[in-house]
Amino acid sequence: MTIHSYSLDNGLNIHIKQDTRAPVVLSQIWYKVGSSYEPKGITGISHMLEHMMFKGTSKYTKEDMNSLVENNGGVQNAFTSFDYTAYYQFWHKKNLELSLSIESSRMSDLQFDDNEFKPEKKVVLEERNLRVDDKAFSFAFEQFMKLAYKDTGRYAPIIGWREDIENYKLEDLKNWYQQHYAPNNANIIIAGDIDPKQSFELVKEYFQDIPRSSIENIQTNEPRFNVGYRYSQIKKSPNETSAVMMGYITPSLTTDYNDNDPYALMILSNILGGADASILQQKIVREDNLCCHIDSEYSPFTKGEDIFVITAIANQDESLESIQDKIESIITNVKQTKVTQTQLDRAKVVIKSDKVFSMDSLETQANLIGSLASIGLDVDYYKYINKLYDVSIEDVHRVLSKYFNKENLTSLHLLKD
């Protein structure tokens, strides 16, 4: 995957991926700040600022931003994560310059209006209601993450705690913007039917005069391994399903641990609960009929430690304690017997096939480049996928033995009330 990378004197990094299959361009800007950077008291401020970024600049009113994109047949949006906040326009390639003009204006001269801020805060509170507070499973998972990431930058949800959202001040937004929205804290990603060199020159034209900012080096505490078993339970409506959530603290590719561990954990996630043929699916869903669904999830592409999550949706009236005991028993058995070569080979093929096929999407290409750049990793995604083939049975056994023990486990049971 050929990626053309450049940088400006003010610290802005640019990554361009040419794809000539259609006359379109996806232009993105990624800021290296997300909810994991936020101190207590203003959790969710990155997400709140994302909303305010569409309220206008000195050059473009909010109506201008919307009409320019819509009238040119494009779409625009944004998203916030633990590690970054990104904005994008997707439209005909002739509009690349307009994308860059909009984003340079937003980076340098966003307008903050209390008359826009107050109603938008209500919008965010309602978004929290719809996505989290009114959904038992989402609310429970939020509490599970809080427990697992206790005393770290990821303890709070991306959208923020309700009481913090209610107490935001406009000055909080201004300060967050001034601290983090600067060229030396951003990556521009351009993917589509464009000329890389010409695209870089356009970026240079619109961004080179924006000054650097003194970015505060925020040190976020990371979760520690083997700090003791953490458990909680939540009761909810009797009409909703019950669930078991389990998580083991594990390293990512950004942490200073054995470089093979994240790749072995990717393989293990697929073998344990990543597909219909996975061990947990076969044992707990099909053979024992304890759950209607179970899966495992792990990503090596995070800033700091990650959590290897196992989620099980219980069948009617099944004991959640029995389900967790069964999962732990299966993990212990896999430790003792090891995975088979067939399981290992199948997982490698499935993971690589899924990733390669997903790269057919322009959005996926750009999002991968942007997320990798934002957490300080090499943007050549295939480099990581190819390393999966080096994972051995012993590597998988090693990570099972190292990380999958009771002292490194957090679990939450979502019970019927």
Please name every model-derived segment.
Residues 1-35, 59-95, 131-185, 209-255, ...:
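Non-catalytic beta-strand/loop surface segments
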Residues 34-42:
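Short pre-active-site segment immediately N-terminal to the catalytic Zn-binding motif
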Residues 43-57:
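Active-site SXXK
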Residues 56, 90-121, 275, 300-358:
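M16/insulysin-pitrilysin zinc metalloprotease superfamily fold
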Residues 106, 127, 202-209, 249, ...:
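Generic, well-ordered alpha-helical scaffold segments in large soluble proteins
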Residues 370-380, 388:
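C-terminal, helix-dominated tail/subdomain
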